[in-house]
Amino acid sequence: MKPGMHVDNLHVERTSRFEQERNGKDNIMIETMQWVRPEEIEARSMAIIEAEMPEGNWTPGELAVVKRCIHTAADFDYASNLYFSDGAVELAVNLMKSGRGFTIVTDTNMALAGVNKAALKQLNGTVRCFMADPDVAAEAKERGVTRAIVSMEHAAKLTGPVIFAIGNAPTALIRLYEMMQKGEIQPDFIIGTPVGFVNVVESKELICQSDVPCIVARGRKGGSNIAAAVCNALMYQVTRA
C-alpha cells in the first residue's frame, strides 16, 4: 500500500482498474460481433451448420430435419443420433400435404407451443396435448400411473391421421407401443425424442423396432424442443418449398 493511502481508496483504485479492463474486453467482443439483419439470422445459422457438420448419407428431406434439430439445440450430436425409418420423411410430408388434415399429439405444452402454428394452419393441421386436461390428471391419480400414459390412451380415440410428437415422457412411447402391439392404435407417424436417463433409451428403441414410420433421437438426448423442431422441419418442406 502506498504511504498515506487508505484501504477504502485502494479498493476503489483496484475496482476502477478492473472495470477499465473489463470494459476494454467488452468493447473488443462487441467489435468482433457480426451485425446481422433479423431476417438473415436463421439463414446465417444454417450456413454455419452446413459448414461444420460431418458428412452423411441423408436424403435431402432427412438432412433438413437433422439441420433443424442441430439449429434448435446447437448440438451436432443430432447428426449421428437421429434415426429415420425407411422413407419416413417422404411419408410424413405426403401426409401433411394431402389436404386431409392431420393432428399432432404432443406430450408437453412446451412442444405444443413450439410447433409453428402458421405452417400448421396452412396445412390444415391441428396440435393437441392432453397432459393438462383435468380428467387426464384425475384418472392418472386414481390409477396410480403417469399422465403421459393416460394422455396417450385419450389420443387413441382421435380420428383422422395422427402424428405423435413425444419429447419428454418415455412412458408415453412405452404405452403407445403396448397399444400398437394389442391393435388398439395404429399411429400414422411417431416422432420420439424424450430426454433423460430412466427408460428413455429403451422406449425409443421400441419405436425404432416397430413397423410405424418414425423419426427417433436415439440415446439420452432429446426434449420437447427437438420434438417440435422435427414437426416444423417436416412442415417447412411443404410450406417453404
What would you call each of these model-derived segments?
Residues 108-180, 187-188, 194-196, 204:
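Conserved mixed alpha/beta catalytic, RNA-binding, or beta-rich assembly cores of soluble enzyme
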Residues 47-58, 71-78, 97-103, 120, ...:
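Generic secondary-structure signature for well-ordered alpha-helical cores
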Residues 28-103:
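Electropositive, gly/pro-rich neighborhoods at or near active sites that engage anionic ligands
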